[in-house]
């Protein structure tokens, strides 16, 4: 068995989000040896640039510009193409923000702690970057892995028509009927966006009102705006199972009328986010988490 290659650095950053890339660039500018580990080259720059703020607002703007006569599928495809072109440019800018420093090493792969200041990096599934295991030790290690969608344990939630806020940005085909599970900011943003793109949208909230973290008068006003746009909102509703079929996915527990379950062409599950630390081996670094 071949021993893994080793690297040493002054600073090791796990994850290319805003805080990590800024710190890495600053340390590299002062001549420090920096290693940046990112599991996917598609995430150079972090969530905001690649799958969060910028791409979603690009799609929101495109949806707002759609005219009534525009074909939803064709218009959505053009909007996604424009989104991807912009994100590709920003991703490349962020790559060079670090790669152009002589003291920075960029590693594509998945990191896991093997000691307090040492990680093992393995090739990401399907990745084209790292081809062998790598051990990296550093004086300072920064965990900058961000968050990921928190999906509830509901039967059928791994079905082909079930999406997160990331995958729905490239959904194919365009959903004539979209169900949104969760009535927080992300779910409602996508609900309004896809309604503007031309989908029939139903929002399903487990609680008795939308935007539970906001003041009640704010939530009431937002609900009125969404319903005026033609969005159906079901509160006090929980989906117990997703059943995929030839006509779409049936959401058992959500009333679609006449006593039958609601059926959708695509489902967005927007039920919150959690720290993306499950596979980091934090216990090996002596890090305790709740």
What residue ranges belong to the model's regions?
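Glycine-rich FAD pyrophosphate-binding loop
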Residues: 28-47, 199-210
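A Rossmann-like FAD-binding core segment of flavoenzymes
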Residues: 105-108, 112-128, 197-290
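Glycine-rich dinucleotide-binding loop and its adjacent helix/turn
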Residues: 53, 145-200, 283-290
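N-terminal Rossmann-like dinucleotide/flavin-binding domain of flavoprotein oxidoreductases
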Residues: 2-9, 47-138, 214-240
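N-terminal Rossmann-like FAD-binding beta1-loop-alpha1 element of flavoenzymes
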Residues: 9-36, 187-195
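Residue-level detector of alpha-helix initiation sites
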Residues: 17-22, 43, 48, 148-149, ...
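Beta1/beta-strand and adjacent pyrophosphate-binding region of the FAD-binding site
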Residues: 3-17, 174-184
């Amino acid at each position: 068995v071949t021993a893994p290659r080793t690297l040493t650095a002054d600073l090791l950053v796990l994850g290319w989000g805003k805080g990590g890339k800024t710190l890495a660039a600053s340390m590299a500018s002062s001549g420090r040896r920096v290693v940046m580990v990112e599991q996917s080259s598609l995430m150079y720059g972090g969530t905001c640039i690649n799958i969060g703020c910028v791409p979603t607002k690009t799609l929101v703007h495109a949806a707002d510009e759609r005219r009534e006569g525009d074909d939803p599928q064709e218009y959505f495809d053009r909007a996604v193409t424009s989104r991807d072109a912009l994100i590709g440019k920003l991703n490349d800018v962020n790559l060079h923000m670090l790669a152009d420093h002589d003291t920075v090493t960029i590693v594509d792969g998945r990191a896991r702690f093997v000691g307090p200041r040492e990680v093992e990096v393995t090739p990401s599934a399907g990745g084209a970057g790292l081809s062998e295991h790598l051990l990296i030790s550093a004086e300072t290690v920064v965990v900058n892995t961000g968050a990921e969608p928190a999906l509830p344990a509901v039967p059928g939630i791994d079905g082909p028509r079930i999406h997160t806020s990331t995958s729905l940005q490239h959904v194919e085909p365009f959903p004539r009927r979209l169900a949104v599970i969760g009535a927080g900011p992300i779910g409602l943003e996508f609900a309004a966006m896809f309604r503007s793109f031309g989908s029939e949208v139903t929002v399903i909230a487990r609680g008795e009102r939308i935007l539970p973290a906001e003041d009640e008068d704010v939530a009431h006003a937002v609900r009125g705006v969404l319903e005026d746009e033609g969005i159906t909102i079901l509160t006090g509703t929980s989906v117990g199972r997703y059943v995929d079929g030839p006509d779409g996915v049936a959401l058992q527990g959500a009333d679609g009328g006449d006593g039958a379950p609601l059926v959708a062409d695509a489902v967005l599950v927007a039920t919150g986010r959690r720290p993306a630390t499950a596979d980091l081996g934090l216990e090996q670094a002596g890090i305790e988490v709740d």
